[in-house]
UniProtKB/Swiss-Prot annotation:
This is Kelch domain-containing protein 2. Kelch repeats lie at residues 31-85, 92-136, 148-207, 221-259, 271-311, 322-359. Component of a CRL2(KLHDC2) E3 ubiquitin-protein ligase complex, also named ECS(KLHDC2) complex, composed of CUL2, Elongin BC (ELOB and ELOC), RBX1 and substrate-specific adapter KLHDC2. May form oligomers as a KLHDC2-ELOB-ELOC complex; this interaction is autoinhibitory for the E3 ligase complex as the substrate-binding site of KLHDC2 is blocked in the oligomer. Interacts with CREB3; interaction is direct and specific as it does not interact with CREB1, ATF4, ATF6, JUN, FOS, CEBPA or herpes simplex virus transactivator VP16. Substrate-recognition component of a Cul2-RING (CRL2) E3 ubiquitin-protein ligase complex of the DesCEND (destruction via C-end degrons) pathway, which recognizes a C-degron located at the extreme C terminus of target proteins, leading to their ubiquitination and degradation. The C-degron recognized by the DesCEND pathway is usually a motif of less than ten residues and can be present in full-length proteins, truncated proteins or proteolytically cleaved forms. GO terms for biological process: proteasome-mediated ubiquitin-dependent protein catabolic process; protein ubiquitination; ubiquitin-dependent protein catabolic process via the C-end degron rule pathway. The keyword Acyltransferase does not apply.
């Protein structure tokens, strides 16, 4: 479950609130790290990951694979949905995206090692129970791995890097064995810089021929798509956790390294990088080469090629191997992760807290709703005058559960 050789074992009326599904409302999911979270702009879908075992001397354990948690970004409420079908094994370090409310899941690490299986779950389904479907894709797949990144462009999912097994077939790119993995495993693993494309219309794998200077092999890096550019920042390669920034042109497949002006974030892995506008990326948290958890946040301005430190109220809440999703309201929603050195397994402080970063000005509707809620006693008799969709939002917010956690 670690980012390299230290094996931790183990984003009108609001859209449908999933009332039609078999669901349970609970305060919040269990604490976890190494999970996936994706967003349709209004809901954040959380799956997988692992947590510490409360019994001293026992290993960490994976979270139940059937559980899909849905966080309403407007109301701050959680729902748990039990899924069925070709349910993926419980895993950490998988890679996931949400496209048109369809969840795609690839790779990860489970109790028997790494995998390269591909799954999808359609959250638009009319069925009362959401169904996972394992897709048998055409072509040569990526090797079995975890801690990789993904870009979404047109009808393509483009995967980059990761940590896992040597490819069984000949692939384009570099694979570097982790020498220490020979000591504690019969299936040694390593880092790679492979780029693989999955066409979501044909479900066929392919590899592009890239040009330019490719980034070094890496894992636990962070990827973000803006326009036709796939950005990648940081990650771990051997003993170094890096702070280099690159982008891949997703039309021409040319790599470019960016050398930003001024100060830059320190090297890290297990961080998050989230597109928040057509010109900005938002970076939060991570883990340094010196094994220090980070709580700093930065915005990267694409047009100016510069990093700007972002002030926020969570400086005492470092996070690594967390997730981050953008909402339609100009917020970045961070969930879970570890607050200390994840590699000291019996002391790992996994979290189930939601951290909300406002990276864009709030809309007038949002400000008005917050004012109505703030002065609820004074304005309650006038609520019936609100448009139906606004009244729905107000009522949901009053039922909101606390987003704070462990």
């Amino acid at each position: 479950m670690a980012d390299g050789n230290e094996d931790a074992r183990a984003e009108d009326m609001p859209g449908p609130a999933f009332e039609g599904y078999e669901a349970m409302e609970l305060a919040c999911p269990a604490e976890r790290s190494g999970h996936v979270a994706v967003s349709d702009g209004r809901h954040m879908f959380v799956w997988g990951g692992y947590k510490s075992n409360q019994v001293r001397g026992l290993y960490d354990f994976y979270l139940p694979r059937e559980e899909l948690w849905i966080y309403n970004m407007e109301t701050g409420r959680w729902k748990k949905i039990n899924t069925e079908g070709d349910v993926p094994p419980s895993m950490s370090g998988s890679c996931a995206v949400c496209v048109d409310r369809v969840l795609y899941l690839f790779g990860g690490h489970h109790s028997r090692g790494n995998t390269n299986k591909f799954y999808m779950l359609d959250s638009r389904s009319a069925d009362r129970v959401l169904q996972w479907e394992r897709i048998d894709c055409q072509g040569i797949p990526p090797s079995s791995k975890d801690k990789l990144g993904v870009w979404v462009y047109k009808n393509k999912l483009i995967f980059f890097g990761g940590y896992g097994y040597l490819p069984e077939d000949k692939v384009l790119g570099t694979f570097e064995f982790d020498e220490t993995s020979f000591w504690n495993s019969s299936h040694p693993r390593g880092w790679n810089d492979h780029v693989h494309i999955l066409d979501t219309e044909t479900f066929a794998w392919s590899q592009p021929i890239t040009t330019g200077k490719a980034p070094s092999p890496r894992a636990a890096h962070a990827c973000a798509t803006v326009g036709n550019k796939g950005f990648v920042f940081g990650g771990r390669y051997r003993d170094a956790r890096m702070n280099d920034l690159h982008y891949l042109n997703l039309d021409t497949w040319e790599w470019n390294e960016l050398i930003p002006q001024g100060i830059c974030p320190v090297g890290r892995s297990w961080h998050s990088l989230t597109p928040v506008s057509s010109d900005h990326l938002f970076l939060f948290g991570g883990f340094t080469t010196e094994k220090q958890p980070l709580s700093d946040a930065w915005t990267y301005c694409i047009s100016k090629n510069e990093w700007i430190q972002f002030n926020h109220p969570y400086v005492e809440k470092p996070r690594l191997w967390h997730t981050a999703c953008a909402s339609d309201e100009g917020e970045v929603i961070v969930f879970g992760g570890c607050a200390n050195n994840l590699l000291v397994h019996h002391r790992a402080a996994h979290s189930n807290e939601v951290l909300i970063f406002s990276v864009q000005p709030k809309s007038l509707v949002r400000l008005s709703l917050e004012a109505v809620i703030c002065f609820k006693e004074m304005l309650a008799n006038s609520w019936s005058c609100l448009p139906k969709h606004l009244l729905h939002s107000v009522n949901q917010r009053f039922g909101s559960n606390n987003t704070s956690g462990s």
